[in-house]
């Protein structure tokens, strides 16, 4: 099941309540403010603080 990008309009980071961005390659939602990544499992975002992992922005070399 694919992630529905329309959800980005209504979901928010559970920590700071800020906007989330979709990382299609990694199948996760990113909060750049808190630098956290939330997994997407079977098309459903898992927006639990204890399931978030630290996120580092990828830089091109």
Swiss-Prot record:
GO cellular component labels: cytosol
InterPro entries reported in the protein's UniProt record: Trm112-like (IPR005651)
Lineage, uppermost ranks: Bacteria, Pseudomonadati, Pseudomonadota, Gammaproteobacteria, Alteromonadales
Coiled-coil spans in chain: none
Gene3D superfamilies, alphabetized: 2.20.25.10
Superkingdom as given in the UniProt entry: Bacteria
HAMAP family cross-referenced by the UniProt entry: UPF0434
Disulfide cysteine pairs (residue numbers): none
Family stated for the protein in its record: Belongs to the UPF0434 family.
Protein name: UPF0434 protein Sama_1339
